[in-house]
Amino acid sequence: NSMKNIIDKLEEDVEYIHRKRLSKLTYSGHKKISRIERKSAIIAFSAEEVYAIAELIRRQKGGAAIVMGSLSPKTRNSQVELYQSGDVDFLVATDAIGMGINMDLDYVYFSNLKKFDGKKLRKLNLSEIGQIACRAGRYLNDGSFGITGECKDISPDEVEHLENHKF
């Protein structure tokens, strides 16, 4: 849906195929980082915040892989493999995980719902939140998303849209 208007302007004869999510996505609210379950991703929107959260997890829980768009493909792939192989139980990432990286995640927690877009700091729109939150649970495995740290709560209306995949 987020790209439909743009694609329609570029190409007239396009067929859209909508595939239903086969698993349930639920909102789990706020959790302290120390209480976040294994097989979780914590999403941040600056390298400084990603590294700070990863260090906190390392001290409290033993380690985390890091995925950011600024990493080289080789480094990013090795970090994904570190997580996927079970060497670490947590992933700290930017919104880069929302674009073509499928991982075995049960939970996604946002440390922030604002990002710098190259011009200004702005709130994520619902489709951006949904693209990232939907990394939790895949195929037939249910997943959940929530917030952590100082992140402001997601409104009940937004939660309903996200849980029902209307974004």
Feature-to-residue mapping (PLM):
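Conserved two-lobed SF2 helicase motor
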Residues: 42, 83-102
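Conserved helicase motor
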Residues: 20-24, 45-48, 65-78, 94-98
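Conserved strand-helix element at the start of the C-terminal RecA-like helicase core
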Residues: 2-3, 34-60, 64-68
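Flexible beta-alpha connector loops of hexameric P-loop NTPases
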Residues: 41, 65-73, 115-123
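Short, charged, surface-exposed secondary-structure boundary motifs
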Residues: 23-30, 73-79, 118-124
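Conserved catalytic network of the ASCE P-loop NTPase/AAA+ motor domain
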Residues: 8, 32-36, 58-59, 82-85, ...
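Conserved segment of the helicase C-terminal RecA-like domain
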Residues: 2-3, 7, 86, 90, ...
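Post-DEXD/H (motif II) to motif III coupling segment of the RecA-like Helicase ATP-binding lobe
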Residues: 1-22
